[in-house]
Amino acid sequence: MKKVITYGTYDLFHQGHYNLLKRAKELGDYLIVGVTSDYFDKSRGKFNVRDSLMTRIENVKATGFADEIVVEEYFGQKIDDIKKYGVDIFTVGSDWKGYFDYLNEYCHVVYLERTKGISSTQIRNINNLRLGIVGNESVLDRFLDELKFVS
């Protein structure tokens, strides 16, 4: 049996998360998904996570792709989990390309292409804009459409 493991925060769960988990599952027979704890996120400087740990776990569970879900709580846990669960493949999104190459010592590392045009950061930014703009809804919609073309 080929075991695959992936990790993420999975905040504001969206199609990109779903696609990544689906492709991770297709890499093997058994998928373990690590969801970062609130404490671990904060220790890495991620202070803008909106969803609770339980909500994020439930969202991952609802996809039906995860055979097992673990909570990532500390630096170095990836190596410990790979050894503990006898993992064959570690996978994450291509935005991390090269960052986890050191794990090739323990298993095969695969970087999956991200879903273009969506991220939790983009969703947060759009929600912040919506909260910060008062006025006609059609003006807001046009403004948000125009943002797609401005970098």
Predicted segments — roles?
Residues 1-151:
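Nucleotidyltransferase catalytic core that binds NTPs
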